[in-house]
A protein has these predicted regions:
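Long extracytoplasmic/lumenal interhelical loops at the membrane interface
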Residues: 288-307, 311, 315, 319-359, ...
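A membrane-periplasm/extracellular boundary helix in multi-pass inner-membrane enzymes
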Residues: 142, 146-151, 251-297, 312-315, ...
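Helix-loop-helix junctions and helix-breaking kinks within/between transmembrane helices
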Residues: 39-50, 92, 96-104, 191-193, ...
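Transmembrane signal-anchor hairpin modules in multi-pass inner-membrane enzymes, especially those
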Residues: 1-94, 124, 428-456
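Transmembrane alpha-helical segments and their membrane-water interfaces
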Residues: 94-150
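Transmembrane alpha-helices of multi-pass inner-membrane enzymes
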Residues: 394-456
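Hydrophobic transmembrane alpha-helices and their immediate junctions
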Residues: 359-398, 434
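Alpha-helical transmembrane segments of multi-pass inner-membrane proteins
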Residues: 130-253
Length: 456
């Protein structure tokens, strides 16, 4: 790019009201979307509704006053078509009014992702997600320590999620106080899988933050340690596979940068073949693998859930049952469909099956195409730019995709916001990116590491 036409990087006035207000709105929004159960357990469904409504109004106000036209123009045809397919499934649903409302709620959730893409650059975004993750993980560890060491027992939510005085199952507790007994911890999120999900994202943004922003060495070490600790204590096998995919992707992207096209593509072919062989081996040997990892051979009931979901899909493969995102209690065919150990489950535990089940085959095809295009664009951004900053979007994206073969988090809350953010922001013109360096990321990271070691 011509140096004359390259835009000058804006240095934000971090003490200005505008900067602080939008940053705090982002903090509160990301926290609420990542920790929705935490908010609900603390202030109830009514409080959660008020919280969400206030944040949505604030987001609309921030968006409207900042001239978002160019960002809105970057919304791709695939995302617009996906919303259209979801509305079509709602129109053909037996509970069409509820389904239309669910599409609206999904669009409202996506609006926050649109605003994040518009209001912040990639560097500011990594700080936002890092700071929120630090708070969530530190609070989770303190919460678990309080339950296990001081209270020495389980903690119920302030607003319980069951009727009567008898707790139906352990899953209804906010935390089970397992910090010292070897079982899974739940943290302030109230769910071990959610804690692992946030920990995976945290691990990525902490590493990138350490590489590019120059955060205090001790803060970075403590942050990375908390992410690793929460990952290990939450014991999510699905997230374990996702983290492995993230690590392999990071190595491949660093190795491929700056290489000739034929060399890059050779790396990619080897990586894809290895990933395919690994995935097939895991599926064929899932019983032995999951038993060795201390899990049930059916992946904690997932194979049973998938069989039931596929049975429903074959009854309405084209139009779907109508979009809901999370399955709604009391609605057929979801009420009582999946009950494990007295706990009802309201997702297919696979984002692709859930999209097909609810939105129909058209929504699934559009969704898959949108993910593929976004993956390619994010990968190109990570490999072609010399700054480590642009690694975090593709690594988080890959982690989300792999995790959502055993979960459906991508279709709601923080998952949908991140997907919307990546789908839109990756389409920003090159002029809005940071300047290219003279050496590949792997060289700069090695030099930075050596320099830090010498300074110790």
């Amino acid at each position: 790019m011509d140096p004359i036409t390259r835009p000058i990087r804006v240095i934000y006035d971090t003490k200005s009201w505008e900067y602080r207000s939008k940053t705090w709105l982002a903090y509160l929004g990301v926290f609420g979307l990542a920790c929705g159960d935490t908010v609900r357990y603390t202030i109830g469904w009514t409080g959660l509704g008020i919280w969400s409504g206030v944040l949505f109004i604030a987001t609309l106000w921030m968006l409207a006053r900042s001239n978002p036209i160019e960002t809105i123009k970057r919304i791709p045809w695939s995302m617009i078509a996906l919303y259209g397919a979801l509305l079509l499934s709602a129109a053909l649903s037996n509970y069409w009014l509820i389904s239309v409302g669910a599409v609206v709620i999904t669009a409202i959730t996506g609006t926050f992702g649109l605003w994040l893409a518009h209001a912040f650059d990639w560097r500011h975004l990594v700080r936002i997600f890092a700071n929120v993750s630090r708070f969530v993980l530190a609070s989770s560890l303190l919460f678990e320590f309080y339950a296990a060491a001081i209270l020495r027992g389980r903690i119920l939510p302030f607003f319980k999620n069951f009727e009567g005085e008898i707790v139906p199952a352990k899953a209804y507790y906010w935390t089970q106080g397992n910090l010292f007994n070897g079982d899974r911890i739940q943290g302030i999120l109230g769910n071990a899988n959610l804690l692992a999900y946030v920990s995976m994202i945290a691990l990525i943004v902490f590493a990138v933050e350490f590489a590019i922003i120059g955060t205090s060495r001790w803060i970075s070490i403590a942050s990375l340690a908390s992410a690793v600790l929460c990952l290990s204590l939450s014991k999510s096998v699905g997230i374990g596979f996702a983290v492995a995919a993230v690590l392999v992707s990071a190595v491949v992207s660093l190795a491929a940068e700056g290489q000739p096209k034929d060399v890059r593509h050779r790396y990619y072919r080897v990586a894809w073949v290895a990933a395919g062989i690994f995935a097939v081996a895991v599926w064929l040997m899932r019983g032995e693998i999951f038993t060795a990892l201390g899990k049930s051979p059916d992946m904690t009931g997932r194979t049973m859930i998938w069989k039931k979901v596929l049975g429903l899909i074959w009854d309405r493969p084209f139009q779907g049952y109508g979009w809901l995102s999370y399955w709604m209690p009391g609605i057929e065919p979801y009420e009582g469909l999946v009950v494990i150990n007295k706990v009802s489950y309201y997702q297919a535990h696979n984002a692709f099956l859930d999209m097909w089940l609810q939105g129909g085959i058209l929504a699934l095809i559009i969704f898959t195409v949108m993910l593929f295009i976004t993956f390619v664009k994010l990968w190109q951004l990570a490999v072609r730019h010399t700054s480590s900053l642009y690694l975090w979007p593709i690594l988080v994206f890959i982690g989300l995709i792999v995790q959502n073969f055993t979960e459906s988090r991508l279709l709601s809350e923080l998952g949908w916001v991140l997907l919307t953010l990546f789908v839109i922001k990756v389409r920003e013109p090159e002029e809005m990116l940071e300047p290219l360096g003279r050496s590949p990321k792997r060289v700069r990271l090695l030099y930075r590491g050596l320099r830090r070691n010498r300074s110790q």
